[in-house]
């Protein structure tokens, strides 16, 4: 009878997949750290491998080149943005919307490192059509998620109106992040959030 301590092929496959995903996330964390610290010019396969503490050969196993590496990092940031506007079970729609509007000005999103990273990633849009496409897709995905929250909080709104409000809020939020890189003004940030609430919850 086989020992319980022996891993089945399926268990080994799951463990291998988990390790692979962890390594890739470790590498993407390193890409974002290098981008925030050194800008796009500082990103290389070797620099990211050093930051991640992995062998260069492992980098090349997961990512073909610098472009694919940065593209993956952009997509990851887009996923994180989308999570900010995901509906949360158990909360009234209005509260979900208000919480989402406040989450974007949490300390983690107003730190110097994060704002520098955000600026670097946005600056990639004119550099390469692939980066532009990923950036645009991420912005649209966030905007559409926000429009859904607006619609849930105000069911009487036409879909077009909810979408327009989400688009207007996105402009304010992006401007907030950019300005916060240059001027640390908490009062202005709080007013901007209140303005977003007014846009979202207008009758």
Feature map (PLM): residue ranges:
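Short loop-to-helix capping motifs
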Residues: 39, 124-129
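Short, basic, alpha-helical segments at the C-terminal edge of helix-turn-helix-like DNA-binding modules
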Residues: 75-81
């Amino acid at each position: 009878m086989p020992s319980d301590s022996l891993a089945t092929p399926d268990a080994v496959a799951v463990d291998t997949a988990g390790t692979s995903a962890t390594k890739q996330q470790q590498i993407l964390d390193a890409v974002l750290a290098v981008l925030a610290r050194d800008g796009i010019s500082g990103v290389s396969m070797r620099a990211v491998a050093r930051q991640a503490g992995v062998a260069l050969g492992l980098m090349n196993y997961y990512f073909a080149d610098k472009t694919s590496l940065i593209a993956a990092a952009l997509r990851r940031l887009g996923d994180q943005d989308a999570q900010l506007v995901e509906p949360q079970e158990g909360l009234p729609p209005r509260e979900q919307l208000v919480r989402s509007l406040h989450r974007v000005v949490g300390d983690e999103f107003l730190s110097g490192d994060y704002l520098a990273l955000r600026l670097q990633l946005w600056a990639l849009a004119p550099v390469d059509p692939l980066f532009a496409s990923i950036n645009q897709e991420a912005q649209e995905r966030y905007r559409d998620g926000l429009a859904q929250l607006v619609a849930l909080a105000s069911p009487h709104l036409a879909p077009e109106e909810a979408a327009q409000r989400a688009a207007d809020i996105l402009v304010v939020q992006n401007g907030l992040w950019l300005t916060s890189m240059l001027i640390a003004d908490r009062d202005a940030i709080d007013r901007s959030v209140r303005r977003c609430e007014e846009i979202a919850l207008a009758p």
